């Protein structure tokens, strides 16, 4: 009798995706993050679903409902801590996943890469609207500052901002619609993740060497299921350590105060995973220029496949490109640090220097390094 998983219409899809999938024999732990992101998404959806059962999206009761969840709902404190810190783990995995893609040249699978960038933008949108929901000071002012950026768009900006707000400022209508967006977006992310996998399985995975691995494939199960399980254990360990021992480590103390439109916090800043983009936004004195730089800092990922000049796919054997990659990483860490600092010297100039370096690194220096490495590897005799 033929194995049911190979014949049943539904099980067959699962089998071809997670069991009998031919995978390169040499993919490292950097290839674990896809499955970890899937787990993060499921954790966020499940904890979010239970939180939504007790949350009220009204300006008068939103803050109190979150306090009620933490105090009175069975394990409500745990749900909230897992949800808040799960978002941080989600973004850690996302950034590492994107970094892996850049380092090993995975972006040359253009469809998979472009869907991935759309996924990144969708997750960022979801996290932003989610941060507004507890209706603390930083929630309210973060929403006000970021949505207000839309007003920088010429001609239609103010109308657009008021349309998003549902009024003349961030208020009850804004909170209600943000809750609706925050509920629906994770399911859109799930659908996009399926499309992402669909495109990936059309070509098969890349591998650290960047060489076509078709001659040496192994089944996904048990080799990579057990490898992913190890990554999963480490992820859950980190998440639980964060959620149980220092749940407020990555949050903002201002968010423990209810939203007050009459009192502006001394330093408005988003969650840590948006700080790099926020630093780029702030480093440009012009409002519209800042908004364009903010968008460009993320959308630049879409043109990375067009900037690939090297004969080799991966950076594994390209030391100059490797050096530039790690300079880019250090640059992003610097921007993240600057985004969390007040707008004063020396932070202003450091932020401007880091922002100025970010774009030439990707647009000029890395493609030039690829060409230089091609020249160095050409036989000269």
UniProtKB/Swiss-Prot annotation:
> Topology versus the membrane, per the UniProt entry?
Multi-pass membrane protein
Its annotated compartments are: Mitochondrion inner membrane
Which cofactors go with this protein? heme b
The answer to whether keyword GTP-binding applies is no
- Nucleus among the record's keywords? no
Top-level taxon of origin? Eukaryota
| Binding-site positions, heme b b562 | 182
Q: Where are the transmembrane segments?
A: 33-53, 77-98, 113-133, 178-198, 226-246, 288-308, 320-340, 347-367
A GO term, aspect molecular function: metal ion binding
The record, for InterPro entries, names:
Cyt_b/b6_C, Cyt_b/b6_C_sf, Cyt_b/b6_N, Cytb/b6-like_sf, Cytochrome_b, Cytochrome_b_C_euk/bac, Cytochrome_b_N_euk/bac, Di-haem_cyt_TM
Tell me the protein family, please: Belongs to the cytochrome b family.
Subunit info? The cytochrome bc1 complex contains 11 subunits: 3 respiratory subunits (MT-CYB, CYC1 and UQCRFS1), 2 core proteins (UQCRC1 and UQCRC2) and 6 low-molecular weight proteins (UQCRH/QCR6, UQCRB/QCR7, UQCRQ/QCR8, UQCR10/QCR9, UQCR11/QCR10 and a cleavage product of UQCRFS1). This cytochrome bc1 complex then forms a dimer.
Q: What is this protein called?
A: Cytochrome b
What is the originating organism of this protein?
Dasyurus maculatus
Gene encoding the protein: MT-CYB
